[in-house]
Amino acid sequence: MKDTDKPLLPLSAFQQAIIGMAMVAMGAGMTINFVVVAPLARKAGLTEIEVAGILTLSAALYALLIPTWGRLADRFGRKRVMVFSMFAMGLTNMIFVLALKAALAGLVTGLSTFFLLAFVRLWFGLLAPGLQPAAMAAMTDATTPLTRAGGLGMLGACMSVGSIIGPAGATVLAPYGALMPIWGSIIFNLSAGLLLAFALPPTRKRPKSSTRPKPLAVRDSRVFPHLAFLFCYFFAIGMVQQTMSWFIEDRYKFTGTATRTADEAVVLHTGIAFACLAAGMIIMQFGFVQPRRPDPRKILPVGLAFVATGYVCADFFFPFWSLALSFFTIGCGAALAVPAANALGSLSVERHEQGSAAALLAAAPPSGFIFGPLVGATLYSLLPSLPLYTAAGVMSLLAIYALLVTSRRPLTPI
């Protein structure tokens, strides 16, 4: 093996797994708010658009500051930035929960509630974005050109897994209180920060003679169509995730019982829906995709059709079991569509550029979640079923594009 093919700053498999677990914790901590905060903030007196505005403003700040935190990671060390990011996320979420509890208790009312929650949530967008660029940079230095795409792809997959585990985990913790799922994610974030602090080696300087892979431009003609495709996909996902807890609350009109409050019932049933989605993803991923390794060009339109069908059925059929089954279908489709879209994006460039392509494609989910939740909340205020049908329409258009355009493009040889 040539020196140029050796990792610049190698990490053991265990250390890489710890970074992956931190990405899972980050994904869970970001998406749990759609299950818990959305219905409770509305109960505190905020409108749907105000709730989405708080989360959207924070997500926009988060996405805009990722490059800045990447430069800080290069200057002060990847480990320091990753540990700081996990603790910042846990602590800012803790302060946000306390502010929300104050609003629910009536200590803060009216427009003051919106400004308090928005101000507290902004600190998440300011302080927490460092994990993703620092982890990507650390994985880039810890891999060779041959293993880089797989390493960076693993980080993106971990973030996606976390985004599903967060809402699904609410099913387990909701019986202990409507806010318990967020407390669980806070403990997860802080624990991940401690593991990063103890498991990763001290910050090491990169060899002066080494050069990092040149990043791809966003408008690179080979990758941009795949980036735009994934942005549209996660834009649609964001519309539904933001509004699903409201949809379940307004449709089924839960009432309090001797064993649980109406708020706990909303969080529990929303968590069940997302748990079914997670089950569909796991079964499809490990029961079909992994053992058979199908052509991504063929499974992409099929997966998108599954997702679109699930969204339509979620509104068309009333019983909760049918909604849960619809989300299971969505999960099956997502397990086909997302890995296929990412794989096609990575394969669109030369082998030595695949790591850079994977890092660029990883920007699609947070970018989609900047606009999707706010648009979804606006549509929901007009008609509760509009986000589901709009998302289904977006998925249908993407499926048609994948069938007529993407499926006819040749795969770049690996």
What is the meaning of each model-derived region?
Residues 24, 106-130, 231, 322-336:
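Hydrophobic core of transmembrane alpha-helices in multi-pass small-molecule transporters
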Residues 296-341:
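C-terminal transmembrane helical hairpin of 12-TM major facilitator-type secondary transporters
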Residues 120-159:
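Cytoplasmic helix-loop-helix junction between adjacent transmembrane helices
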Residues 193-210, 404-414:
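Helix-loop junctions on the cytosolic side of multi-pass membrane transporters
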Residues 87-110, 305-318:
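C-terminal ends and interior cores of transmembrane alpha-helices
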Residues 9-59, 225, 234-257:
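Helix-loop boundary and gating motifs at the non-cytosolic
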Residues 62-64, 269-292:
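Transmembrane alpha-helices of Major Facilitator/SLC transporters
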Residues 2-13, 201-229:
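Juxtamembrane intracellular "pre-TM" segments in multi-pass secondary transporters
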